[in-house]
Amino acid sequence: MNFAEVLLERKLLLIGSFVLTSGKVSPYYLDLRPLPNYPEFYDIVNQAIKKAKDIPHDIIVGIATGGVPLSAFIACNLKEPMGYIRIEKKGHGTNRTLELDVKGKRVLLVDDVATTGVSIEKATLEILNGGGKVSDALVIIDRQEGASQRLEKLGVKLHSLFKISEILDELLKSDKLKDNEKKSILDYLVKNVEK
């Protein structure tokens, strides 16, 4: 079973009509937060470790909540420091968004999915405010809806294990989707996915 089929089988990729954070209506939704519950996550971790080894950094920071499990596994395997960042303040306790000292450190940001790049952008700006440097971000899936271009303006390169076009191409070739689902997804890709 390829990763596209795993996503569908494990209900991490849902087909239907979903309103995204950006307000766009999408014919598919990715929810990778449950991925660590499945054995296929370890294949993803191994791919991410290989990518992370090639990216210069001093510390790994996971973006809550989706990026935290992956960043923890990468950091433990590479025996490197790790922390996490919240995009929104909790409103209680210390009210911090950044749960580590990044001053003077090169930070590798990790998240599960990138769509428009707003979450990674906010995390980058928070790290810069904390005195850290961000030149790279690593995600499992890039939805290819502008994240790489947004981050490029900040000097951040987006690395992904998979691009949504590759995943959906696999599913479109298979018999896993109904004809109307294929049409809806193809129409969405033509209008929204960066080339």
Curated annotation (Swiss-Prot):
Enzyme class: transferase
UniProt-recorded name of the protein: Orotate phosphoribosyltransferase
Organism: Saccharolobus solfataricus (strain ATCC 35092 / DSM 1617 / JCM 11322 / P2) (Sulfolobus solfataricus)
Keywords of this entry: Glycosyltransferase, Magnesium, Pyrimidine biosynthesis, Transferase
The organism's taxonomic lineage, starting at the top: Archaea, Thermoproteota, Thermoprotei, Sulfolobales, Sulfolobaceae
Catalytic reaction(s) noted: orotidine 5'-phosphate + diphosphate = orotate + 5-phospho-alpha-D-ribose 1-diphosphate
GO molecular function annotation: magnesium ion binding; orotate phosphoribosyltransferase activity
GO biological process terms on file: 'de novo' UMP biosynthetic process; pyrimidine nucleobase biosynthetic process; UMP biosynthetic process
Protein function: Catalyzes the transfer of a ribosyl phosphate group from 5-phosphoribose 1-diphosphate to orotate, leading to the formation of orotidine monophosphate (OMP).
Complex and partners: Homodimer.
Gene (name only): pyrE
Glycosyltransferase among keywords: yes
Binding-site residues for orotate, renumbered to this chain: T115, R143
